[in-house]
Amino acid sequence: MSGKVAVLGAGSWATALSRLLSKKGCQVVMWSASSEQAREINETRENRHYLPGVMLPADIEVTLDLEKALYKAKAVVYGVPSHAFREVARRSLPYLPENAVLVNVAKGIEEESLYRMSQVFAEEAGLSMLDRYVVLSGPSHAEEVGRDIPTAVVVASPNMERAEQVQDLFMCESFRVYTNPDVVGVELGGALKNIIALGTGIADGLGFGDNTKAALMTRGLAEISRLGMVMGANPLTFAGLSGVGDLIVTCTSMHSRNRRAGMAIGQGKSLEEALSMVKMVVEGVRTTRAARRLSEKHAVQMPITEQIHRVLFEGLSPAVAVNKLMTRGKTHEMEEVALAAAMVGKIKL
């Protein structure tokens, strides 16, 4: 696929993807809600606040005019944070070109409705529009994609023809793209791993070691899988790029906002202080609240998520939270996953 691509948003991820698409020969128009940001990028070819040091091709245009950005676009990339997705999706609807493929790259759960991003889009645009909807997710820090460091991601859609369109749109020698029909699993994996990354950051802040982080990541993946299966995901998806892949990179990377915020909390900072230090959106904070409610709604045990919620919002000491996790009642490693699978008829106990 070639032609015009509208990228809605001008954060780090939207900027990195705009650069990638431009280098592939697409006509890229970015939409920003900030006149100062649009002017800076157009004049300096750099997004100094969100992706410093990465120079953008001269033919990328940044506009404040949403209608202009979307005019005759063959593909539309929604590159805004999850809490802003509904509003931007709603505003874009009158200007969406007929038959344009729609790509969402936000990783989160809407806190008020508990909807995944595809559900938010369907509510705003109608179920029929999901035929054009594709989610892109996986272990992909903008700081590395913007420097052409080899990266692999996954795109998911109920319409595999659309998924393959997006695969062709983004795929290049430094950015490998796989397809997957499991929209539920890909969206949940990308959202829920941010909670566990907060936890591994807290462990780092407390001075714990690799054993602790490995335990959090492994048992965190079990929580993600349990909830995902009950919500209709294919459990195999969580063994892929949007599951364990994204979990690893977000829990271990110096680029991870969620890990950095967690580390500050582990070192004794308040949530507000930690968010101020990171200076960018930390998706895991909102997702923690949403995931806790989802676990209650679906009667799924998520002990790590529960303790992180208590640390973030109920004043529990991080050290006490670790103690509560370590002194839980004993259980079989596979028992909880098997119970979740049995609830959705995947396997028999």
UniProtKB/Swiss-Prot annotation:
GO terms for molecular function: glycerol-3-phosphate dehydrogenase [NAD(P)+] activity; NAD binding. Sn-glycerol 3-phosphate binds at K107, G138, S140, K193, D246, S256, R257, N258. NADPH binds at S12, W13, K107, A142, R257, V281, E283. It comes from the Bacteria. Its main location: cytoplasm. Keywords: Cytoplasm, Lipid biosynthesis, Lipid metabolism, NAD, NADP, Nucleotide-binding, Oxidoreductase, Phospholipid biosynthesis, Phospholipid metabolism. Pfam families: NAD_Gly3P_dh_C (PF07479), NAD_Gly3P_dh_N (PF01210). The active site is at K193. Catalyzes the reduction of the glycolytic intermediate dihydroxyacetone phosphate (DHAP) to sn-glycerol 3-phosphate (G3P), the key precursor for phospholipid synthesis. This is Glycerol-3-phosphate dehydrogenase [NAD(P)+]. It comes from Pelotomaculum thermopropionicum (strain DSM 13744 / JCM 10971 / SI). The lineage of its organism: Bacteria, Bacillati, Bacillota, Clostridia, Eubacteriales.
